[in-house]
Curated annotation (Swiss-Prot):
The lineage of its organism: Eukaryota, Metazoa, Ecdysozoa, Arthropoda, Hexapoda. The keyword Signal applies. Expressed by the venom gland. Residues 24-41 form a propeptide. Transmembrane segments: none annotated. This is Venom peptide 4b. Not found in venom, suggesting that it is a minor component. Negative results: Has no activity against fungi (B.cinerea and C.albicans) and bacteria (E.coli and S.aureus). Has no hemolytic activity against human erythrocytes. Does not show cytolytic activity against insect cell lines. Does not induce feeding disorder in lepidopteran larvae after peptide injection in the vicinity of the head and thorax. The modification Alanine amide is found at A51. It comes from Eumenes pomiformis (Potter wasp).
Length: 52
C-alpha cells in the first residue's frame, strides 16, 4: 500500500516536471495580429457555401 502511494506521488511529480519543462507561454489575447500574415483565398465552393 505504501509503495502504491509512493508510486502515485512519483508519477505526479514526473508529469508536472515534464509539463513544466515543455510549457510554452500562450500568446496574449491582446497581442497585435501579425501584419505579415496573409488570409487564405476562398475557393469558389467556399464562396458558394457562404452565399447560401
Amino acid at each position: 500500500m505504501r509503495s502504491a502511494i509512493l508510486l502515485v506521488i512519483v508519477a505526479i511529480v514526473a508529469i508536472l516536471g515534464f509539463l513544466g519543462v515543455n510549457a510554452e507561454p500562450l500568446p496574449s489575447p491582446l497581442a497585435e495580429p501579425n501584419p505579415h500574415a496573409k488570409a487564405a483565398p476562398l475557393s469558389p465552393a467556399a464562396m458558394a457555401s457562404l452565399a447560401g
